[in-house]
Amino acid sequence: MKQRYTHYIIGMLTALLLVACDAHRDFPDTAMKPCHILCTDGKVLSYEDYEKSGKQAIAVVFHINQREDVEGNGYAVYLWDIEPKAFADSIGIAQGTSADLTAYDGNINTFAMYGTTDTFSPLAESVFDIWRYGQSAYIPSVAQMRLLYAAKAVVSPIIEKCGGDPLPDETNDCWYWTSTEVKGQQTAKAWLYSLGSGAMQETPKIQAHRARPI
């Protein structure tokens, strides 16, 4: 009886040691982080893993969402600019986008621009044209452009490594459309955002400017 009890104790100690060893095992960190690469097949990889993978990059992660009230797990910026396009082809129509400067609603805004039948949005059309391999894209809101501006210093070199257009610093080459209309002037103006300085500028919607989809 005593011998059987001793064997039982030894067995229990061995099991506890095995559990303890398992608890300290190192696992690879697969969490999505800023500067990770979004590939055309939907995979998100670190830059080091992307280089080995042979996959095609389409965007670079620049922000991870921590808030439950914000849609999606995070944001990735498209590698290339959209050539200058007008927000709308005519003045006088509110296109149904938000005028809230704090809302992370670029996806909803872009769909509203695209779906407005009383006026045509060359900008929204050009963004919808770049959808491929199931990867959606949209024009960021003012709030989302602020997040991109805050991450520019770390994200832009990775964009360039992937063969994309680096986020600009030049004063005269840094203005991009947002999908946010100007409050009280929704029928005529929307906001431009400077990725050079973080400044904003209300602008007639019929003017052609670049966009950087996310």
What would you call each of these model-derived segments?
Residues 3, 56-59, 171-178:
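Short small/polar-residue motifs
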Residues 1-19:
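Sec-dependent bacterial lipoprotein signal peptides
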Residues 21-133, 205-214:
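Short, compositionally biased
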Residues 71, 180-214:
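Solvent-exposed, polar surface segments
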Residues 120-137, 142-195:
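An exposed tryptophan-centered "aromatic clamp" motif
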